Amino acid sequence: MTCKMSQLERNIETIINTFHQYSVKLGHPDTLNQGEFKELVRKDLQNFLKKENKNEKVIEHIMEDLDTNADKQLSFEEFIMLMARLTWASHEKMHEGDEGPGHHHKPGLGEGTP
């Protein structure tokens, strides 16, 4: 009998599968080179990184910041730090200006006005 995955578990699988969708294109199949990373950011993070996508140098800087071992590639471990940062930033945006009792959510990153 197969257990049905929760939404969170499916979302984790989606992150892994998306990473591999790009990482297998060139070079080592389990790392993202600069071109693969740029393509992933442009296609799959176009709303979360709207401003950053307009400037190629900014995307390069993001990769350099994530590339902790300076090998010009991103391992999954390095890439997942971007996912963690974006998740945190989106959560913070949802609570921006949220004061007082209760728990309210506004649109996060990639939501709201274009």
Curated annotation (Swiss-Prot):
<dbReference type="GO" id="GO:0050729">
    <property type="term" value="P:positive regulation of inflammatory response"/>
</dbReference>
<dbReference type="GO" id="GO:0005886">
    <property type="term" value="C:plasma membrane"/>
</dbReference>
<dbReference type="GO" id="GO:0051092">
    <property type="term" value="P:positive regulation of NF-kappaB transcription factor activity"/>
</dbReference>
<feature type="compositionally biased region" description="Basic and acidic residues">
    <location>
        <begin position="93"/>
        <end position="102"/>
    </location>
</feature>
<dbReference type="GO" id="GO:0050544">
    <property type="term" value="F:arachidonate binding"/>
</dbReference>
<dbReference type="GO" id="GO:0008017">
    <property type="term" value="F:microtubule binding"/>
</dbReference>
<feature type="binding site">
    <location>
        <position position="23"/>
    </location>
    <ligand>
        <name>Ca(2+) 1</name>
    </ligand>
</feature>
<dbReference type="GO" id="GO:0002544">
    <property type="term" value="P:chronic inflammatory response"/>
</dbReference>
<dbReference type="GO" id="GO:0005615">
    <property type="term" value="C:extracellular space"/>
</dbReference>
<keyword id="KW-0963">Cytoplasm</keyword>
<dbReference type="GO" id="GO:0045087">
    <property type="term" value="P:innate immune response"/>
</dbReference>
<comment type="subunit">
    <text>Homodimer. Preferentially exists as a heterodimer or heterotetramer with S100A8 known as calprotectin (S100A8/A9). S100A9 interacts with ATP2A2. S100A9 interacts with AGER, and with the heterodimeric complex formed by TLR4 and LY96 in the presence of calcium and/or zinc ions. S100A9 binds quinoline-3-carboxamides in the presence of calcium and/or zinc ions. S100A9 interacts with amyloid-beta protein 40. Calprotectin (S100A8/9) interacts with CEACAM3 and tubulin filaments in a calcium-dependent manner.</text>
</comment>
<dbReference type="GO" id="GO:0010976">
    <property type="term" value="P:positive regulation of neuron projection development"/>
</dbReference>
<feature type="binding site">
    <location>
        <position position="91"/>
    </location>
    <ligand>
        <name>Zn(2+)</name>
    </ligand>
</feature>
<feature type="binding site">
    <location>
        <position position="31"/>
    </location>
    <ligand>
        <name>Ca(2+) 1</name>
    </ligand>
</feature>
<dbReference type="GO" id="GO:0005829">
    <property type="term" value="C:cytosol"/>
</dbReference>
<keyword id="KW-0702">S-nitrosylation</keyword>
<keyword id="KW-0391">Immunity</keyword>
<dbReference type="GO" id="GO:0035662">
    <property type="term" value="F:Toll-like receptor 4 binding"/>
</dbReference>
<dbReference type="InterPro" id="IPR002048">
    <property type="entry name" value="EF_hand_dom"/>
</dbReference>
<keyword id="KW-0677">Repeat</keyword>
<feature type="binding site">
    <location>
        <position position="28"/>
    </location>
    <ligand>
        <name>Ca(2+) 1</name>
    </ligand>
</feature>
<keyword id="KW-0072">Autophagy</keyword>
<dbReference type="GO" id="GO:0005856">
    <property type="term" value="C:cytoskeleton"/>
</dbReference>
<feature type="region of interest" description="Disordered">
    <location>
        <begin position="93"/>
        <end position="114"/>
    </location>
</feature>
<dbReference type="GO" id="GO:0048306">
    <property type="term" value="F:calcium-dependent protein binding"/>
</dbReference>
<keyword id="KW-0053">Apoptosis</keyword>
<dbReference type="GO" id="GO:1990660">
    <property type="term" value="C:calprotectin complex"/>
</dbReference>
<keyword id="KW-0488">Methylation</keyword>
<dbReference type="GO" id="GO:0030593">
    <property type="term" value="P:neutrophil chemotaxis"/>
</dbReference>
<dbReference type="GO" id="GO:0070062">
    <property type="term" value="C:extracellular exosome"/>
</dbReference>
<dbReference type="GO" id="GO:0006954">
    <property type="term" value="P:inflammatory response"/>
</dbReference>
<dbReference type="GO" id="GO:0034774">
    <property type="term" value="C:secretory granule lumen"/>
</dbReference>
<dbReference type="GO" id="GO:0043542">
    <property type="term" value="P:endothelial cell migration"/>
</dbReference>
<feature type="binding site">
    <location>
        <position position="95"/>
    </location>
    <ligand>
        <name>Zn(2+)</name>
    </ligand>
</feature>
<feature type="binding site">
    <location>
        <position position="71"/>
    </location>
    <ligand>
        <name>Ca(2+) 2</name>
    </ligand>
</feature>
<feature type="modified residue" description="Blocked amino end (Thr)">
    <location>
        <position position="2"/>
    </location>
</feature>
<protein>
    <recommendedName>
        <fullName>Protein S100-A9</fullName>
    </recommendedName>
</protein>
<dbReference type="GO" id="GO:0034121">
    <property type="term" value="P:regulation of toll-like receptor signaling pathway"/>
</dbReference>
<dbReference type="GO" id="GO:0042742">
    <property type="term" value="P:defense response to bacterium"/>
</dbReference>
<dbReference type="GO" id="GO:0014002">
    <property type="term" value="P:astrocyte development"/>
</dbReference>
<dbReference type="GO" id="GO:0050832">
    <property type="term" value="P:defense response to fungus"/>
</dbReference>
